[in-house]
């Protein structure tokens, strides 16, 4: 029995090793098929006005700082990050609309935000429909 388990474990690690050695695709795309060229477009869906604008503005500043640092260091796999920002006005319905616009009109590869749980719940439905990851 232990010999069988050893063989299964070895086969598992061998398959992981072979997958890791595989060639990556020449063209990359996000889940909804938006191709990633020389830049990776990241949507920012934040509360920049309204009742909880302080949360959204603080997060937006942090995101901008991180993107600037990443781009200065050469980007991600040589690709620069580009931010596309939408103000959801601290409203759940507007958060959904902002995510829809970012995913469909702006063709972003991922969306960061919103900052509040109710807005995230509304935006996550859009993420599920469009296949654009929501962070």
Question: Across the structure, where does each feature detected by a protein language model lie?
Answer:
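Positively charged n-region of N-terminal signal peptides that target proteins for export
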Residues: 1-5
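Short coil-to-beta-strand
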Residues: 34-43, 132-135
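Sec-dependent N-terminal signal peptides
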Residues: 7-13
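Short beta-strand segments enriched in small/hydrophobic residues
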Residues: 38-56, 114
